[in-house]
Amino acid sequence: MSFTPTDYNAYDFANRRHIGPSPSEMEEMLRVVGVSSLDQLIEETVPASIRQETPLDWAPLAEHELLARMREVAGKNRVMTSLIGQGYYGTVTPPAIQRNILENPAWYTAYTPYQPEIAQGRLEALLNYQTMVADLTGLPVANASLLDEATAAAEAMTMAERASKSKARAFFVDADCHPQTISVIRTRAEPLGIEVIVGHPAQLVPEDVFGALFQYPGTYGLVRDFTRDIAALHEAKALAVVATDLLALCLLKEPGAMGADIAIGSSQRFGVPMGYGGPHAAFMSCKDDLKRSMPGRLVGVSVDARGNKAYRLALQTREQHIRREKATSNVCTAQALLAVMASFYAVFHGPRGLRAIAERVHLNTVRLATALKEAGARVSPEAFFDTITVEVGVGQAGILAAARHRGINLRKVGRDRVGISLDETTDAGVIARVLDAFGIHEPAPAKVGLGFPEPLLRETGYLSHPVFQMNRAESEMMRYMRRLSDRDLALDRAMIPLGSCTMKLNAAAEMMPITWPEFGTLHPFAPADQAAGYHEAIGDLAQRLCRITGYDAMSMQPNSGAQGEYAGLLTILAYHRARGEAERTICLIPVSAHGTNPASAQMAGMKVVVVKSAPNGDVDLEDFRDKAAAAGDRLAACMITYPSTHGVFEETVREVCRITHEHGGQVYIDGANMNAMVGLVQPGAIGGDVSHLNLHKTFAIPHGGGGPGMGPIGVKAHLAPYLPGHPEVTGPLTGGHDEAADEGPVSAAPYGSASILLISWAYCLMMGGEGLTQATRVAILNANYIAARLRGAYKVLFMGNRGRVAHECILDTRPFAEAGVTVDDIAKRLIDNGFHAPTMSWPVPGTLMVEPTESETKAEIDRFVAALLAIREEIRAVEEGEIAAGDSPLRHAPHTVEDLVADWDRKYPREQGCFPPGSFRVDKYWPPVGRVDNAWGDRNLVCTCPPVESYSIAAQ
């Protein structure tokens, strides 16, 4: 018997691990679709006129090869003790939180909790976060996180403008705010026509402004009471915003006690690594009468169908997916996973633990300041929490270098000062090394007093809710985290077929490096030579993304897709201004566009002109041509999504681009659907001038239950000089282009949430060029397979000229309304089958948009199809009068364990209700609550942890 070696490659990540269907399963699926090969399907789906000719050709790495490469790159970063401060601090991530939250796919693969019945665990964790923020800031309402502190400050400015009764058009910013915050505020204010006045609080003229931002503690350390300044603002009908620090508020008088209207800041130092800039969860809290103006998501308490307490996202009519250009913000992605980590940090330590950490940080700072003063150094300010500034004159460079030689980064302040910010990782050894850098060899004193006046000492309690008072044994913490995760449905349990969301595999090997200290401990403003590994990874990823998209330069700064849109539009406007065409402010946007598009355009100061859709779902070319002509030399841009939001490759995309360019506009191609294009179509080659990429969709960053995300923007060469810059960095921030960007920043850190860029880089490296292209092809196959399987039961709403969809398909459920069955009924019934619902009522009301991605196996897709076919039969029973819609399992869905064991008085069998076709019996997912009453929740708004008795007593 002769030996023949197998040709099976056990290390082929793309085809053996990432892509779901096997080659034999693909053949079966292709037969169902009605084609003989994947090549034929792509030819019938993607117009020949736009297909790219040059393939992506880099070789893939196996998982073990990737991790070796990552170790090599990580070794090029220098792990230092960074005492730079400026909003970023060393912290200790409790291993229990790292292991059970950050590294747990039950938490990091979940989607935004728009379906509350399957998100009760993370909604509770986010409610804990809101309670933590509300308690510490002394304001009654807090949201569930924003992108970063600087963005939160800009959001607070526009919120103050909306809510203030002052007629002024200026906003005052304390000069003691972090420099990156001031820069982001300026970027946001300019297109909105808001004047930004930067100065010291003594220079504030309240009558001249609609609001003011104070930093507490200040960026250079000053702690002062703003009560009088805030009262003066209120006299002038202006609002007060305080940028603050949660750890400092464990000791210091809270902003609410000073009369602040809004508080913002970052929760990074609550157990979240710096990560060279992120991701971290920013927070915002406000007075009760401002809650409807607050941006971002808000978790509230409601009841389910049985009257049991249930959590949900409240007041969603404020958000961009509903209000579009009239939304309070364009925020879509937040930082849910990082907010969850911060909330568990507070649960882990409790109020006494947090105060002990705050005291330790503060008293260490007092010891350091005292030792410096005793040695003759000039130290300021007189009142501080964790940050001091030392006047060093011409010796600045020498002291900074001496500190670096001892493994410590200090902050360069002006030409003659050095800033020092201590944190929870600071010990006596670190203090001794700092003193040594100043030539001081005497130890710091052991016994010291407060470093700020006693009237600034906090008098009120915080975190009194039982969740923050629980037994802090790790066994209890572990079980609490497990209980919450068991309430949720994430990718670790089932397919999440959300259209336009691309819930693909987030592979373990891609995730592992983000927790390594070589990546996690770097400060975003550390000297560049300490981050050589980061720069290599970011630069290589940027170049690969340029090859994928056909663009010439890539900015990695935007922290979300919506922020990428905003940055891209600002880039276009800056380009027009540089050409003397500042009057170009009109943006054409199809009516079917994602809600962030018009919201972003409005934020950029553009006038939105809506373009109709043709009956087949395409952009109405005649209407587009007319409106472009009407705009004429006022046309700034058009924003289109490709493939379209209807899930189709439109044949007319080149013509849309041509018309826009003919009238002097720029083409923004939204990259939300890039998962249908990688390796097949380059947006930069079909007429696009700028696109953002949702790395948390196409490039494998997990959704984290509602963030983090990343939205880098690619541009053609003529736009590269107008990409976002940053006040802390000189030289180019872009990949693929040598020209330095000098526009204002859109986020706090130069490279946004830099640490999670490693995930997308790892994905590109392991997939290889051919694997990325194959992933796109299989994503298109999976969507067409679902469309083919369901076509007889549901109408597939939009298809291309040859009857194909792209990577997603829209199922029309509107005809069922005549029988009283709603799209909500279908979505909730899918929960009984163990599935997250597809995207509901967008881009067409009353429809479901399904996107399976390339990562789902045929077996899982078939289970999903079986569930939808069974639901169709239940609808048919209603249509034919066998059962009323209100009595059907559709209306009573989802079914809970409480339903299963209760007396059964329903007009369908218990078996049908609780174990529908497609559901598991042994491993069945049981939602913890029944259908949530959204209207009740908005009428009875509670956005902090409810009293303990409500946990055992059903809501009245």
Swiss-Prot record:
* Protein family membership: Belongs to the GcvP family.
Protein name (record): Glycine dehydrogenase (decarboxylating)
Protein's organism: Cereibacter sphaeroides (strain ATCC 17029 / ATH 2.4.9) (Rhodobacter sphaeroides)
Q: What processes does the entry annotate via GO biological process terms?
A: glycine decarboxylation via glycine cleavage system
| Subunit structure, as described in the record | The glycine cleavage system is composed of four proteins: P, T, L and H.
Is the keyword Transport assigned to this protein?
Answer: no
Function summary:
The glycine cleavage system catalyzes the degradation of glycine. The P protein binds the alpha-amino group of glycine through its pyridoxal phosphate cofactor; CO(2) is released and the remaining methylamine moiety is then transferred to the lipoamide cofactor of the H protein.
Any one GO molecular-function label of the UniProt entry: glycine dehydrogenase (decarboxylating) activity
